[in-house]
């Protein structure tokens, strides 16, 4: 009944924000957590450049399972991006380590959490909602919507689709199955996923990264974690980890593609969905 262009909502504890906006056909679409983080960081970077506030010491942070499109935006705009483990204590750690030497300008994760300022050391929906309103006003000044800005990002930096698959294994037998699955991935790492060769494997339990030729380099992380990541030649990223709170193993899938124009979203998304299904078939999930 009310002609809205955007709907946003905080969680009851005010730590995460979700949103929906209208697409180019006037239909409501949900913006996922990866897209939310991407939009926030894209705007922060572009706004700092446009207003002359960008400094060589600026940096942003994302978690290792969050979309790699953020890295593409950071690299093209020559800003340092740091990867950390899931959880905002790790983002807060990066802020603390660089306090007085570098300037944190934003960071987030794929599960709708974002931290826009460094005076809060946890995900904060209050400042995120204020930032969201600012982005919407910025878009409107250009005659665009939030959806249009997202399409602009995909055209400039490439299209990506992210999917999380949860494989539930209840009980003690389930915990044993999850352990066996992780052990099997380590003992028999896939050489190909979804029809594309694996070019890099990261094992955060051993803190080692191994490329397709067997060359091993160290991962610079503060401690070990039971997480595996696979990167393929076509830009796909798969992250695998047992849940720390529930009886399940989580697969974070991100596939890449090209999007030639803002109106090409449907075809780019359809191709990405095919890639996701191919990845799931390869992994047996």
Show the residue positions of the predicted features.
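A short, sequence-level motif marking secondary-structure junctions
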Residues: 35-37, 242-246
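Short, well-ordered strand-loop elements centered on a beta-strand within folded domains, enriched
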Residues: 10, 27-31, 249-253
């Amino acid at each position: 009944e009310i002609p809205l262009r955007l709907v946003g909502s905080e969680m009851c504890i005010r730590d995460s924000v979700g949103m929906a906006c209208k697409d180019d056909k006037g239909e409501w679409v949900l913006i996922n957590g990866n897209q939310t983080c991407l939009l926030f960081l894209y705007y922060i970077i572009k706004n700092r450049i446009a207003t002359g506030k960008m400094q060589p010491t600026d940096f942003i942070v994302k978690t290792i399972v969050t979309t790699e499109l953020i890295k593409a935006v950071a690299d093209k705009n020559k800003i340092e991006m740091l990867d950390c483990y899931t959880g905002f204590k790790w983002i807060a750690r990066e802020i603390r380590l660089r306090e007085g030497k570098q300037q944190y300008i934003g960071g987030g994760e794929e599960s709708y959490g974002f931290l826009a300022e460094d005076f809060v050391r946890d995900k904060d929906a209050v400042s995120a909602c204020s930032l969201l309103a600012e982005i919407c006003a910025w878009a409107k000044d250009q005659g665009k919507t939030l959806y249009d800005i997202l399409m602009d990002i995909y055209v400039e930096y490439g299209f990506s689709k992210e999917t999380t698959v949860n494989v539930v294994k209840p009980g003690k037998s389930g915990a044993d199955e999850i352990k066996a699955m992780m052990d099997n991935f380590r003992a028999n790492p896939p050489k190909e996923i979804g029809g594309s060769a694996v070019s890099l494997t990261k094992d955060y339990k051993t803190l080692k990264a191994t490329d397709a030729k067997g060359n091993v380099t160290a991962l610079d992380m503060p401690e070990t974690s039971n997480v595996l990541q696979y990167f393929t030649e076509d830009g796909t990223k798969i992250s695998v980890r047992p849940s720390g709170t529930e009886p399940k193993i989580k697969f974070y899938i991100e596939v890449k593609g090209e999007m030639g124009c803002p109106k090409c979203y449907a075809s780019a998304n359809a191709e990405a969905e095919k890639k996701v299904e191919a990845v799931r078939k390869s992994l047996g999930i």
